[in-house]
Amino acid sequence: MIRINDLTVTYRGDHKAIDALSLNVEPGEFVLLTGPSGCGKSTLARCLNGLIPHASQAAMAGEVRVDGVSTTEQTVAQMATRVGLVFQNPSTQLFGSTVDDELAFGPRNLGLPPEEVVERTSFALAATGIGHLRERDTKGLSSGEQQRVAIAAVLSMRPKVLVLDEPTSNLDLKGTKAVLGTLAHLRREYGLTILIIEHRLSEAGALADRVLIMDQGKILLDGATEAIFRQREVLSQLGIRHPEPPHEALSAEIYPEPVPVEQNGLKPLVEMSGVEAGYGSEPVLRDLNLAVRPQEFVALVGDNGAGKTTVARLLAGLLKPQQGDVAWNENLRRLPLGRKVGLLFQNPLQQLFCDTVEEEVAFGPDNFGLRSDGRLETIIGVAGLSELRQRNPFALSVGQQQRVALASILALEPALLILDEPTMGQDWGSLSRVMDFLTSLNGHGQAILLITHDYKLVRRYAQRILLLEDGKVFSVAPGTGPFRRLNKQKERQYEVLSA
């Protein structure tokens, strides 16, 4: 189904993203592709549907054939009926006014009769479990909901090969199970060939019969899933997270040990009182109360669409509450907003605009008169950006862009750092280095609010967990109802592994 021979892809500056790579994938295979951030995984995905070379400034050599045709001899539109590609950032491929319009766009452009367009959109909605979103505005969806819509839109084209670039990175447990269950069904019932790019191996690894590990533009390892997963030393050296067997995942509670629920005695940095907020007539948050104190490392968890990003936007001053109050500590009120709070968006492209990585990291401090070359060097180094400092941020992988955005925020030394789903595009090694550095800052007073669906990250770093449910925040402590509900959600997450 996929035949790649001696593929080399070079971006501006002679940077080889893919280096003499050859690969065959047979019809009906389910292949998991993983590797360190920036190793060329997403570039390879874009070669499969013709975006490279037809819609990219990258230079391509070698041959890529899918379903018997060469990608260089077909247009991107022609390849869309053979290869469906779902990007890491779903917002970059959604443009329909409603979800139904989005799913119908591709089939309509194939010239299909209206009844078949309806049949295809209905199938895609059901397959991804988003029938309830059919009439929703795509711009008003959460990131996780957008991801599922992007997958459904690709499915409506009925491709023979489905390529997904970190499709579960922004999904909650229910969404992850729905997407992976859909992929298993599509392969089983329709013989679809599936290539999934992931850093989190447990879930996708349970479905894959083959694993590819890339490094520096080459296929380093290629073999059966169990055989590759046994090579733990190689995985560790590459910064790849070891897959957790289901029984190990179920035995690990949210907290590794009991954590006291009493506060640290310090006055809150920021306090939300009786907040009601949303984007239309129906509020997302209702009578929400939340306080974050210095030296706290707080995790905010909850389903997609629960309002976690809305909380982040309120704290960052990007959204005004419809009712209630967001009050900062009196010692911080006179500081510019960028010194009080730093928000890492889910989509790093929304906060990158300079020509080089170094300029991006220095931009904030330069404008506030806070530049410290020593601190900038430390941050660039910890973020793993030393060798990329003169590169254009827009030419980097999503994982690298995420670290550039985080470094630019840390350079301003905000009192409160908010990380909204920081795992997208990150291998475990890069993520651990950054999180360990943040933990050291936390020990010196830095307050951190982590928004994530990754419970391994929560378990390792958070001191306190808050569950956002039905528009309100609940404190999660051992023995409480919210604590039991979260662990029950984890159990449901791994049901898909034995499906």
Predicted regions and their residues:
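Helix-to-loop junction immediately C-terminal to a conserved catalytic motif
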Residues: 49, 316
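Conserved ABC ATPase "signature" region
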Residues: 115-133, 371-388
